[in-house]
């Protein structure tokens, strides 16, 4: 199916006749490719061939994406001809079909074209001269996916123009076999045309009136909105349209187009400066667009099985900061963590949309990420596992990735929802002692986790999958053991894999483990716990089974389950995060309890220090707020955006051969340093007085977590620790004296030893970037990008 279905205004069908130019110069991989750099082409030998004495042959470059990751049936291609060759004499063929008319030399001097009609699978593109030929294999994937994420999750309920009841099939062996669910409304003008949820793209057009007051609200809705919708078939007169000058000095009419479509079984939307009277082809981008992209990631955590619309607004604070400077803004439901906590799917979707932008609008210079909480997870995870998709990230309400917060979440549940609540020894602990064990200023922090996200680990909770409560197809250990499991490990089963337990139930590879963890160790050392209270705590804490049911024994995760999380790139790695500038806007946590704890920004910093040898690429800008998820004030958000833009522009201009990590460090703006302010940064005056992050005057203080009190690293990226013998004379116990009975009881709690935090975790390995899960869970490196080769 041609992915370029469209509705509204003008049709954007990309035909073979779209001949490309103006996409940048030189042989370097364009920034919009955003995938591992293509392997260098062999240097031409005498006469322009591919080796000493070889006949002159062209070079073929697929520039909209890696040649093996193309989707949607088309690819932007450049052909570099040997010096002195007249391309008019050349033959260009796609699987032996002549497509020479798709190419031409453009004003930038590059010979380019958009190749369409690619079949799913391998396609051979050849360019030939009497003196020599070349060919490259382009592997095309369906516009509905997948590309590298592996087998797509089923069932998956496509969105429809208006919500309606549909029949949903359950897993094989489910009782019942099917049930009725209600679709999500798509916001499009037509229903899906296939089971990949593909539907026609909708375009809507807006202009800013020349008479609009300067006090109007930047957006398209509301009585004071700056923009008014129009029909491009009957445009307002130019005199009625305000002028707009972007950040590179280009002046155009203040016109914006919003594109809403489907890709990879999700719904995406783009907003960009766009005048429908211009050509606006990839070789002639919209005049008002500065070539930059802001990607807005949505918050929260969820494992939905429904196609739905994005949760972020293209015209919110971040989008407005970008659009007013000439940026394009992008959103997609699979990059909203509250819809999709599978960050491989998020990365794949982002790559596919960026390819679409490159082929439809032109070259992307660089991409800035933005998002709070789950939106910060998406940024860090994608930057770590799929470097190049994001060039700079602006996390707020930070978490380093999706699954390591489960460490604190499970610990809080085991401690506060069970030991403190149900065990007489736990009930006897004071609030101050409990807070000391938890690593928090109050027990409200664990309470916030337990009430908000502990249920997200429950595979029987239908709402986690987007279904109503008690939906009959969802897993129940007794009534429906073959039902749909609605937890994160199952949502990512194509990447993380699964196992069948002794009870015959298939479960995703999870990460909960507390073998060898000495809860309250720091509290014992500091005198907040007695030796007996420490022993009773570790005797009574227990653990969770595979269905989030508390049990008296501790949780002992399978080594294979733990290891695959690292192997598959689900734990963010400082080695990869060092490749992007990071500006972390750290709001103050709520004093009474907050899942967005201040220490989380330092978790990322600790990973950078441990993995990359420093954190010069990360800025932490603390501001005072009512909760950790509060948005920064307008002036602080603007300062972060402008600083990130300047940082990336400097990196873009750096033509040295230095690795990207070095370029990030050497091009950091001189004034870009850590700081803390006493307000939320609503206006410029709020930013005039700053103090250091650890200054006593900074209101944003750090805490820790139960696992850190137990001796774990602030990086909080060790699911399952390696063990060492119990040695109660160690300095870690702060000189506490244990009776023989207490020693024996601790030895019974830790028969195999206690955590050795000086060693990596079990199965803990560095991220291997750009894994493909097409061959199954665990992932395989993509390997070298395809290049053109001389053809006989």
Question: Which residues fall in each region the model found?
Answer:
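Bacterial N-terminal signal peptides that target proteins for export
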Residues: 1-10
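Bacterial lipoprotein signal-peptidase II cleavage site
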Residues: 24-32
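C-terminal His-loop and adjacent cap/lid subdomain of alpha/beta-hydrolase
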Residues: 31-792
